[in-house]
Regions:
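Nucleotide-activated donor-binding/catalytic signature segment of Leloir-type glycosyltransferases, i.e.
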Residues: 239-266
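Short hydrophobic beta-strand element within catalytic cores of glycosyltransferases
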Residues: 306-309
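A short, well-ordered alpha-helix in the C-terminal region of glycosyltransferases
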Residues: 341, 348-362
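Glycan-recognition and catalytic cores of secretory/periplasmic carbohydrate-active enzymes
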Residues: 224, 252, 366-368, 374, ...
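Conserved acidic donor-binding segment of nucleotide-sugar-dependent glycosyltransferases
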Residues: 321, 325-332, 341-346
Length: 758
């Protein structure tokens, strides 16, 4: 898709919530689909207030004037490059009764258009009902940000359900490492912070929060209520600062000068997000029961704020006692009760904070951009999936998970959990990722230091008999888990990592290659005794890579012996309809056919290649669907008699995507068939939202990766396995890009910010 979209909306520097929303949405679309969408803006102006608009604003419109609206319709029709028009609708933005002037524009438009209703009145009079219904009838699609609004459009306005799309208000995933340090920057050290944000007007109900603070401050003298934001420009033009002055007097009357503070400025996004990040309780006290959505409300939840809110539409859909409280309109007693409860219970606030984040991660702007692209494509009737751009291959979260000893196993959200200890599995994969990085980009001290740590950890795990232990605790001691678990797969992964490092000898220090060589050579005493299919496969991979370093008849014989064993396993398990090595598909499936293909490349035995191709084709038939990959669920393996394709939703882990991509790359290297490259593109897009939830699994803020997809949500933790497997998959896409297009000339430590997946 390479289309031009025109948004008709208020837009910065105009100061209003819809302008901010539109800017955030446009930025998200640009970031996610740069080069695939051309976006232009028709900015709604305020009469008598000329604004200095810059790109992407191409047009301006006085929407309060009927003739201007009609003229704009003709201007849009005359521009053949505009493919689709997107209108942000709110009562008051457009002139005439209930914005009737907009209907004049839309009725003349010969382009398909989408309209987003920011407010849907539940009990409209006949004039409102007619105008909104006509706008909806003319639109190709109608979007709303709450399910309640969608339901009202169907039942009251009689819009067809297939025309209505519910896309939630976007949110920012914002993290600060030191909350107290940011409080200090704002002069709030030692304070318990309650806050609210928005352009001030009487319908914000700020008096409710101020009155509640009288009781709150009695029990918590260090509590401060921040009222963030300037007075709404329209209010200032009409009456100056009379409303703010009344609030100041109310504060004085209640003796709250030390407990209520104004931040009277139009905050930048970064400043706003920092204020929200240090907020202990967010207060939303609007007195408008018909308000459908609030950007600041969802921004606060996304920042991890427990929320106390009046019962407007969005709050009733999103808030429950796991993340906040609903109160009646104008009820300062209820607000004070809940605030006192929360301020007095750190554990409750922490629990609500976590749940608020979980509830809003589906609506981060990257996911909202994906939903919009899917909508645009449905209107344009395009079958070819437009993939998001490749994110940067940064090592920030891998580094965050790594201390002086090695990579820690788990994280709580993005915070490493030292108590989880370390595993050989994770450090072996991390070593492979660092070696891949040095191949794709110039090696530097930062990357090599990480690689050294992971290699040293593998050496630490190697025992006197040259085998490896897997589990290490926070005190760097081997745990009892090593005695109760089958460690063959872990040992196989270590062989894979050591062999891969050796294969990259041209990019790595000789001392590292020699160190890996010694560890691997010592392991020759036991490798041939492996019996687990995946352990055999990992070992074959490592030995294949060893042969890229030096030729060795001993190693070729080892590969042949292991591949012959895997061949026998396959011959026993497979039949005419089940061409696999076991009676079910479980985990790390793709490594089995990949190992057989590598065995063919090492030995030349055609039978190995035949089994590799036959079994991988079978696996792909179960996991690849129409333009997306369905990961085998770890909650319920896919068994022989389970049907044509795996259908279980949830339990999908990032590791399966990475291992499949390794196999696709190997098969492309072996055969040159471009179909494997196309499947690589589709597989990688799972991380970027091309999955059953239509949500990103890669975290664009931390550069880590979430731990997987559940039935209806994304696991928010970002542990070692997920992050490293994503990183390996992302680095494989560097090779994909060079094979699909002209080789990149980039030699920086960090790759170009965007590469196209199309």
């Amino acid at each position: 898709m390479n289309k031009t979209l025109l948004f008709i909306t208020s837009f910065p520097p105009r100061q209003c919530g819809i302008a901010t929303f539109a800017q955030d949405l446009v930025n998200a679309l640009h970031k996610t689909f740069a080069g695939k969408l051309n976006i232009e803006i028709c900015a709604l102006t305020e009469p008598g207030k000329p604004a200095a608009y810059e790109a992407p604003v191409q047009y301006t419109l006085n929407a309060l004037d009927a003739e201007s609206c009609i003229a704009m319709a003709h201007t849009i029709n005359a521009n053949a490059e505009i493919d689709l028009v997107c209108i942000e609708h709110e009562f008051g933005l457009y002139g005439g009764d209930y914005g009737h002037h907009l209907l004049g524009l839309l009725s003349l438009l010969d382009k398909p258009f989408i309209v987003r209703f920011h407010t849907v009145l539940p009990n409209p009079d006949q004039k409102c009902l007619k105008i909104v219904s006509l706008i909806g009838a003319l639109a190709a699609k109608v979007t709303v940000m709450t399910q309640t609004s969608a339901d009202i459009l169907q039942t009251t306005y009689q819009l067809a359900p297939e025309k209505i799309i519910h896309i939630p208000h976007g949110t920012h995933a914002h993290i600060i490492s030191d909350k107290e340090e940011v409080k200090k920057r704002f002069g709030l050290q030692g304070k318990m912070v309650l806050s609210t944000f928005g352009l001030l007007s009487e319908n914000k109900g700020l008096e409710t929060g101020i009155r509640a603070m009288k009781r709150v401050a009695t029990q918590f003298p260090n509590a401060v209520y921040l009222i963030l934001g300037r007075t709404h420009p329209t209010i200032v033009a009409r009456e100056g600062e009379r409303y703010r002055d009344r609030l100041v007097q109310l504060i004085k009357d209640n003796g709250l000068e030390k407990n209520v503070q104004f931040v009277n400025s139009y905050l930048s996004l970064d400043n706003l997000l920092d204020y929200l990040a240090i907020t202990d309780i967010y207060l939303f006290t609007s007195i408008d029961p018909h308000q459908a959505v609030s950007g600041t409300f969802v921004y606060a939840m996304s920042a991890g704020c427990p929320v106390i809110a009046t019962s407007f539409v969005q709050a009733k859909e999103m808030l429950d006692e796991s993340c906040g409280y609903l109160i009646d309109f104008n009820n300062d007693e209820q607000l004070a009760d809940h605030a006192i409860t929360l301020l007095g219970n750190d554990a409750l606030r922490a629990s609500m904070s976590k749940r608020a984040i979980e509830k809003t991660r589906n609506s981060i702007w990257e996911n909202v951009a994906l939903a919009h692209m899917a909508m645009f494509q449905s209107i344009e009737s395009e079958d070819q999936l437009v993939m998001p751009n490749l994110p940067p291959a940064y090592l920030d979260h891998a580094d965050r998970l790594t201390d002086e000893f090695g990579m820690m196993q788990f994280a709580k959200f993005d915070v490493p959990d030292p108590a989880s200890g370390y595993t050989l599995d994770d450090n072996a994969r991390a070593l492979i990722a660092m070696c891949m990085y040095t191949k794709d980009f110039e090696p530097n001290r930062y990357v090599l230091d990480l690689a050294h740590k992971y290699l040293d950890f593998i050496g630490f795990c190697q025992q006197k008999d040259a085998r490896f232990l897997n589990y290490v605790d926070v005190n760097h001691q081997f745990t009892d888990d090593n005695n109760g678990c089958n460690l063959e797969d872990s040992n196989g992964r270590a062989i894979w990592a050591l062999g891969y490092l050796m294969s990259q000898y041209q990019h790595l220090p000789t001392s590292m290659v020699k160190q890996a060589y010694l560890y691997l050579r010592d392991s020759f005493t036991w490798i041939e005794n492996l019996t687990s299919p995946r352990a055999i496969a990992f070992a074959i991979k490592g030995l294949y890579y060893y042969l890229q370093y030096e030729t060795s008849r001993t190693v070729v014989n080892l590969v042949n012996k292991l591949a012959n064993r895997l061949q026998k396993i396959y011959m026993v398990a497979h039949d005419e309809t089940w061409k696999w090595y076991e009676p079910c598909l479980t985990y790390a499936n793709a490594v089995l056919p990949e190992a057989m293909m590598m065995a063919w490349m090492a030995t030349g035995k055609a039978a190995y290649k035949h089994i590799a191709e036959q079994s991988f084709e079978f696996l792909c038939s179960k996991t690849f669907r129409n333009q997306y990959m369905k990961v085998i669920s770890n909650r319920n393996w896919y068994h022989k008699n389970d049907g044509e394709q795996c259908n279980d939703e949830g339990g999908e882990q990032p590791i399966e995507i990475a291992y499949t991509m390794f196999t696709l790359q190997t098969f492309y290297d072996a055969t040159g068939h471009s179909a494997y490259l196309e499947k690589m593109r589709v597989a990688f897009s799972w991380y970027l939202g091309n999955n059953h939830l239509k949500q990103v699994v890669y975290n664009p803020l931390t550069y880590g990766c979430y731990d997987g997809l559940e039935t209806s949500s994304v696991n928010q933790n970002q542990g070692a396995e997920s992050t490293v497997c994503y990183l390996m998959a992302r680095l494989l896409m560097e090779q994909w890009n060079k094979q699909k297009y002209v080789a990149s000339q980039n030699t920086n430590a960090r790759p170009p910010l965007y590469l196209s997946l199309n």
